Amino acid sequence: MLFESIYIQCLNKFSKYKKFVCHTTCNCPNYKIIGYLLYFLCLCRPINCSLPLSRHDLAFGSFSYYLTMFLYRILVRLLQFYYFVKFSAILFLGFAVKGRSLFEKKQREKPNVLEGWDSRYIKLKKVRLHYVQTGSDDKPLMLFIHGYPEFWYSWRFQLKEFADKYRCVAIDQRGYNLSDKPKHVDNYSIDELTGDIRDVIEGLGYDKAIVVAHDWGGLVAWQFAEQYPEMVDKLICCNIPRPGSFRKRIYTSWSQFRKSWYMFFYQNEKIPEMLCSADDMKMLELCFRAKEIGIQNNKNFTDEDLEAWKYSFSMNGASFKYPINYYRNIFNAKKQQADLVLEMPTLIIWGTADGALDIEAAVDSLNTLKQGTMKKIEGASHWVQQDEPEMVNEHIKKFLNKYQ
């Protein structure tokens, strides 16, 4: 009953979390224990502290800090185990129905849509990255960073559009497509990823770049802008908030917490890779074509585009293991400078039909941008630069012209 008593005390003491956790525990019985743990986290921190949690936020001394971190780890482990059981059962049932064909790897030929591009490599300090370029080498650098589960081709509409004025470079991040794939999980930490961006810009002969990013590429771009602001001429992030704003949202919003289920699932070993690869990489089709979360304009994601994705995840030693390792580092990442104001001109483009991220985190991001602008694209999905390329390109053009 002590557990119940603490839970009730938390309900009374932390009213701003009441609606969130009551909804969690009452309407979603499977998450009752998660609701309890969330309230333990609330109990260990002052009402008006900033998020994410830090030593400076905690009003009750080091014991409260360590208790909070201990309970947080329990929460992550519980969710990790819950999704391990859930998706292991799904894979078992799938295997019972389809047998070995569920995990059969198909031989694929390179799709025509990947032909005719200027494909290059750059050797960095630790890895060799692949990139595709449009525009000439003597123009200002516009660097494109893709998200998950993507590769350079997700910027195909932008590579063509901006080639007349810029040297457009779309990289395959480490672990993707034709780039190197280090084996260890630690090789995919945020510090390693931001180091790659620094090395790419310098390796191409520049001291700064216009950085355009989406999803996980955006997380890398935000962190890069914090660590190396002098190397970011302008920053454009598509459907990705600042990490500090995202953490605020996931701690205080059941909507975002629920949408982020896969982050906990990806903490497991092997099962996520097996699920993503199963049934001829059905997961990719769901990501980009499902009504709720996929690209809304079907003409912008053809059957051949889908085949290009499957090709990139099946050739050259590619595996879902390496991109998923990004997520396996996410709970160990150092705390971002949530209150650091970024000085460079920054544009956030947001598709309002994003099934993975709440727009409120993007709006909150503007509070820490000195020259921040946000443009909403109504009805566009999380994959906004592919869903509405004409509108995205127009917003980027106006933004670049404004800050010439």
UniProtKB/Swiss-Prot annotation:
Q: Active site: which residues?
A: D215, Y327, H382
Q: Which residues cross the membrane?
A: 74-96
Enzyme Commission designation: 3.3.2.10
Q: Where in the cell is it found?
A: Membrane
* InterPro entries for this protein: AB_hydrolase_1 (IPR000073), AB_hydrolase_fold (IPR029058), Epox_hydrolase-like (IPR000639)
Report the record's Gene Ontology biological process terms. lipid metabolic process
Asked if the record carries the keyword Manganese, the reply is no
> What domain of life?
Eukaryota
Q: Which SUPFAM superfamilies match?
A: alpha/beta-Hydrolases (SSF53474)
> Which pathway is this protein engaged in?
Lipid metabolism
Which topology term describes how it sits in the membrane?
A: Single-pass membrane protein
Query: What are the AB hydrolase-1 domain coordinates in residue numbering?
Result: 140-389
Q: Name one Pfam family in it.
A: Abhydrolase_1
Report keywords, A-Z. Hydrolase, Lipid metabolism, Membrane, Transmembrane, Transmembrane helix
One GO MF term attached to the UniProt entry: epoxide hydrolase activity
Name where it mostly resides.
Answer: membrane
Q: What happens when the gene is disrupted?
A: RNAi knockdown of both ceeh-1 and ceeh-2 results in the accumulation of 9,10-EpOME and 12,13-EpOME.
According to UniProt, the reaction catalysed is: an epoxide + H2O = an ethanediol; 8,9-epoxy-(5Z,11Z,14Z)-eicosatrienoate + H2O = 8,9-dihydroxy-(5Z,11Z,14Z)-eicosatrienoate; 11,12-epoxy-(5Z,8Z,14Z)-eicosatrienoate + H2O = 11,12-dihydroxy-(5Z,8Z,14Z)-eicosatrienoate; 14,15-epoxy-(5Z,8Z,11Z)-eicosatrienoate + H2O = 14,15-dihydroxy-(5Z,8Z,11Z)-eicosatrienoate
Query: Could you state one GO cellular component term attached to this entry?
Result: membrane
**Which family does this protein fall into?**
Belongs to the AB hydrolase superfamily. Epoxide hydrolase family.
Task performed by this protein? Catalyzes the hydrolysis of epoxide-containing fatty acids. Active against epoxyeicosatrienoic acids (EETs) including 8,9-epoxy-(5Z,11Z,14Z)-eicosatrienoate (8,9-EET), 11,12-epoxy-(5Z,8Z,14Z)-eicosatrienoate (11,12-EET) and 14,15-epoxy-(5Z,8Z,11Z)-eicosatrienoate (14,15-EET) and the linoleic acid metabolites 12,13-epoxy-(9Z)-octadecenoate (12,13-EpOME) and 9,10-epoxy-(12Z)-octadecenoate (9,10-EpOME).
PANTHER family listed in its UniProt record: EPOXIDE HYDROLASE (PTHR43329)
Give the protein name, as stated in the record: Epoxide hydrolase 1
Species of origin reads Caenorhabditis elegans
